[in-house]
Swiss-Prot record:
One of its GO terms (cellular component) is cytosol. It comes from the Bacteria. Transmembrane segments: none annotated. This is Phosphoglucosamine mutase. The lineage of its organism: Bacteria, Pseudomonadati, Pseudomonadota, Gammaproteobacteria, Pasteurellales. It comes from Pasteurella multocida (strain Pm70).
Length: 444
């Protein structure tokens, strides 16, 4: 695979007004994508966005570029990333474009593409778009220019799709649910899905103004959700991130239920129903208690690198249907082609209703081990992880943990940092071991 000049692991992302998140680059990117995709078949591309104010600027620039290349754009308005994956498939569009920086602050944004199948673009198509970006821009004849249209029923279509994943014989009647939409793309969808399934819904983080996405709310900051759940005596709280591909839950006692626990609940329910194909994919950061809990059920578990892209790649490699991260990316491939916060929350809620159990009771099967993370800065040059002393102390700590914990030493890909993570049932022991390793890393 050729080295990427513009595309990262999740499309193009950065600070608005700074290359590559500028109107002129978005125009050129739309044109380059249009030139490549025009040779593929259909001549319409879906464009969705989250609620950042810069989305207006970027969608207009992308549409102009696509039109110049002869492709039409169909706008969905604010829409979760997984909704664009779904709608691209059902509209039989040539591709889907999402304008979002996920859980980042409002002043960041990004542009990523879905294929006609609602999956990541094939490498050869991405490489062709990159090559086209370095070509001079041209314009098709006037009669061949693309058009722009708006999909007025996109929200309703996705709401019905989400509801369709919830068992028809079950209802959320008598459940009080607090929904935190992070002032993001789920604000007009998630609360309505829950209401239409019978729940009493209290909304927070559902008044986007273009500048407040992910600000002290959503999956990356659940304090407000925890307080609201306790205040209104709700059964459960749901927190999504800005583009709706992450889910963190809160039980009726105000406790956080993270992606690892959500993943286990869904896996156990799929096993009971006979729907679990193969095993579960987690990441290097997945809590050891998840691995042990799955093992008790006889469910295979493997770890991918951190990042939902790598989880998905491992799932496809193994032919498995379920994977996720402790940060709340949950991928259920027999329901959608990418991580989907609303779909994941409905899977957990259906387990609660089916067995008449609280979220606290369901999550108690995975009592998370304390994780201690220490970042150690080094002076560049040799990688401390290659030193004999670091390898020796790592081996010593592994032996001390005796299979009841684990260590993870990683070199940052962006800074001169070594990340030291120790995890075990005994939090004090984890802290002690992490500091022991960090001291040796600093000395080397």
């Amino acid at each position: 695979m050729a080295e990427r000049k513009y595309f990262g692991t999740d499309g193009v992302r950065g600070k608005v007004g700074t290359f590559p998140i500028t109107p002129d680059f978005a125009l050129k990117l739309g044109w380059a994508a249009g030139k490549v995709l025009a040779t593929q078949g259909s001549r319409t591309v879906l464009i969705g966005k989250d609620t950042r104010i810069s989305g207006y600027m970027l969608e207009s620039a992308l549409e102009a570029g696509l039109a110049a290349a002869g492709l039409s754009a169909a706008f969905t308005g604010p829409m979760p990333t997984p909704a664009i994956a779904y709608l691209t498939r059902t509209f039989r569009a040539e591709a889907g474009i999402v304008i979002s920086a996920s859980h980042n602050p409002y002043y960041d944004n990004g542009i990523k593409f879905f294929s006609a199948q609602g999956t990541k673009l094939p490498d050869d198509v991405e490489e062709a778009i990159e090559a086209m970006l370095d070509e001079p821009m041209d314009c098709v004849e006037s009669a061949e220019l693309g058009r722009a249209s708006r999909i007025n029923d996109a929200v309703g279509r996705y709401i019905e799709f989400c509801k369709g994943t919830f068992p028809a014989h079950l209802s959320l009647e008598n459940y009080k649910i607090v929904v935190d939409c992070a002032h993001g793309a789920t604000y007009h969808i998630a609360p309505n899905v829950m209401r239409e399934l019978g729940a009493e819904v209290i909304e927070i983080g559902a008044k986007p103004n273009g500048l407040n996405i992910n600000e002290k709310c959503g999956a990356t900051d659940i304090k407000a959700l925890q307080e609201k759940v306790l205040e209104v005596k709700a059964d459960v709280g749901l927190a999504y991130d800005g583009d709706g591909d992450r889910l963190i839950m809160v039980d009726h006692l105000g406790n956080k239920v993270d992606g690892d626990q959500v993943l286990f609940i869904i896996a156990r329910e799929a096993l009971r129903a006979g729907h679990l194909k193969g095993g579960v994919v987690g990441t290097l950061m997945s809590n050891m208690s998840l691995e042990l809990a799955l093992k008790q059920l006889g469910i295979p578990f493997v770890r991918a690198n951190v990042g939902d892209r790598y989880v998905l790649e491992k799932m496809q490699e193994k032919g498995w249907l379920l994977g996720g991260e402790n940060s709340g990316h949950i991928i259920i491939l027999d329901k959608n082609t990418t991580g989907d916060g609303i779909i994941a929350s409905l899977a957990v809620l259906s387990a609660m209703v089916q067995h008449n159990l609280s979220l606290n009771e369901l999550a108690s099967a995975v009592p998370l081990f304390p994780q201690v993370l220490i970042n150690v800065r080094f002076a560049g040059g040799d990688n401390p992880l290659e030193s004999a002393a670091v390898k020796a102390v790592a081996a010593e700590v592994e032996k001390r943990l005796a299979g009841k914990g684990r260590i993870l030493l990683r070199k940052s890909g962006t800074e001169p940092l070594i990340r030291v993570m120790v995890e075990c049932e005994d939090g004090a022991l984890a802290q002690q071991c992490a500091e022991q390793i960090a001291d040796v890393v600093r000395a080397n």
